[in-house]
Amino acid sequence: MRAALERDATARGDREICTVLGNRIAESASRGVAMLARAESAIAPTRDANDALSISPLRDWSVDDIWLMLTMFADEEKRPFPCAFSVRSIERLSDLYRAGNDGMCGVVLGESGQRTACGSRFGCVFCCVVGDRDKSLESMIREPEHAYMAGLNDFRNYLLATQWDLKRRELVGRSLSSAGYVRVQPDVLSFSERMNLLRYLLTLDALEIERAEQHDADLAAGLIPDTPENRDLCDVQFEMITPSQLVAIDFMLSMHHYAPHAFPAVSAWFEVHRLRRRYRIPKVDTFPKVPIVNHGWFRVGQFDADAPAEGLRDFGAEQWNRYRHPGRVSTYAQTTAGERVVYFEQSDHLDVDAERACEFVTCSFDYEWYARVQANAGIESARFWLNETILTLPTGKSQRYQEMAARGQYFARLAERLNLTPAEMDQYLISNAVKEVQQLDLFSMAA
C-alpha cells in the first residue's frame, strides 16, 4: 500500500508522503513509552526507523478530548466546520462504546447533558491478547443490535482454547537445512485445522447474509420498528472471507502436501454458499500449555530424496499457452534462481485481481467444476491462479514460492508412494526422523 501511495505521490510531483497516526500517549503506559522513544510529534513530521515521515496530531489528547471533539460535531447545525463523517456515524460510534461497556457509557451527544468520556477499548474481533474473555465484545452481543457478532466471539474463543492443542499443528518444518533435512516438530496450524477455520468463517459469512435478508423481510412486513438502527441491520454487517482473500487462501492451501484435491478453499466456499452446508464452531475446553517436542530431523535432500517434485512447473500449461495466451512473450517463466515454472506475473506484493477472483469464485466455479477438481492434485490450482494471472507474486520472491510448492508436492508424492493417510504420514515422519544428529552439521540445521 505504501509503495503504491509513493508511486502516486511521485507521479503528482510530490516529494514524499507523510502517514498521519492516531496514537495517543495516554492510551497506555507501554504506548506512551514507545511513542516517546520514537519522538512522535503532534506539530511536526518525524522520521521513523525506515526513514518514513509520520505525524501524530492526537499525541497529547486525553479520551475526554476525543469525545469532546465528537460531541462538537453531533449537531449538524452547530458544527464548527464541515467534516467528512455524518451525525449518524457519531451516534453509531457512541452506541458501540456504550454497548461495549455494559450499556453504562456516560457519553451524551448534543448540547445538553453530562459528558463523561467512555474508556472502553476496541480492536480486532479475534484478538486473543485481551485474555480468556473479550468482555467488551461479550457486553455488546448481549444487546439485540450487536447480537450478529456472537459467532465472531465464538471463533475467537475457539482460537484461544485450541492454541496449545499440538495435534492441530503441522509437523513438517518450513526450513531446509544445507544438509538436506527438515525439522519434525509441531509448528504452524495443520492443513485440516486451517480448513476447519476457513469453513467456520465461511459459515459465519453465510449466516450473516441470511440474518440480513431475514431482518430486511421483517422490516418490510412491519414485524420490527422502522428505526435507523433496524435499517442499518438490513445490510450485511461483515464479510470475513472475500473472493480475493479466498483466492489467496486457496493458492497457499493448494501447495500443501495434505491438500486432497485442487481448489480446496474454493471448494469449501462452494459447499457453504452453494450446497448450503454449515460448519458450526464447537465449544471446546481450553488446552493447557505443554512443551513442544522436537521429534528430530527428516531427510529430504533437495526435495528429491525419495520422490520427485517439480513444484510450480506446469508442463500442460507450457504446451497450451501458445494457443490460449498467444500474446505472451513466453509460455513459461523462471524464478529468481533460474528454475523453470508456470507463467506468472509480479507486483509489489502478493496480489489478487478482485474482479476476476469474484467472477471465478461466484460465477465460473459451478457444480461441474466442483466435481471435476476432486480428481486433480492440489498443486494444480496454485499453478492455475498464476498462469491465469488472477494472482500475482511479489517481485523478486518467486523462488520462495517455488520452494514452498516443491516441499508440499514432495511430501504429497511421498505419501502417495507409501500409500499413507495424513495421520499415517505424520507417524511415519516421527518414526523415521533422525534422533541422533551428532553426525550432522548442527549449525547448518539451525531453524
Label for each model-derived stretch:
Residues 1-447:
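Nucleotide-activated chemistry modules centered on ATP-dependent adenylation/adenylyltransferase
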